[in-house]
Amino acid sequence: MEIFSASNVETRRGPEQWFTGTTWMDVASVPRPGAGLFRVLFEPGARTNWHTHPEGQILYVVSGTGRAQKEGEDVLEIHTGDTVYIAPDEKHWHGAAPDTFMVHIAINPALASDGATDWLEPVTDEDYLARA
């Protein structure tokens, strides 16, 4: 067993090339094989770009209300306590609802790959604001 101290967690603003709007990320690192672990705060209306993960992703909504969408499907509303499973290489996005903050924990497995996210184009306002 190892404990990774919260004092070693780096907080940084989410990069503009990955997000629309303002986000803050707490990045925890664990030795490989392992996973990427991120706590992300999305301000109202903020969201990721479309993206994929080679080994999928798990989101746990800590607080607030958000939105998530798989390419070709309807926008879904996500709430405090919800867990979202995203399959490997599934094109998707996620973020806060238009009028509320949302915080989630993102777990990106990296057992057979480097776990790198493939960041794609921004989510249009039309896609983001589609009825959830």
Regions found by a protein language model. Give the residues of each.
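Conserved short histidine dyad/triad with adjacent acidic residue
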Residues: 36-53, 88
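Conserved strand-loop elements at the edges of beta-sheets that form or border functional pockets
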Residues: 30, 52, 60, 78-80, ...
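Short beta-strand His + acidic residue motifs that chelate non-heme Fe in jelly-roll/DSBH
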Residues: 48-50, 68-69, 91-98
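Short acidic-glycine-tyrosine-enriched beta hairpin
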Residues: 72-88
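Short, conserved beta-strand element in jelly-roll/cupin
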Residues: 41-43, 52-68, 107-110
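A short, N-terminal "cap"/entry segment at the start of jelly-roll beta-barrel domains
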Residues: 1-35, 116-132
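A short hydrophobic beta-strand segment most commonly corresponding to one strand
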Residues: 58, 85, 99-119
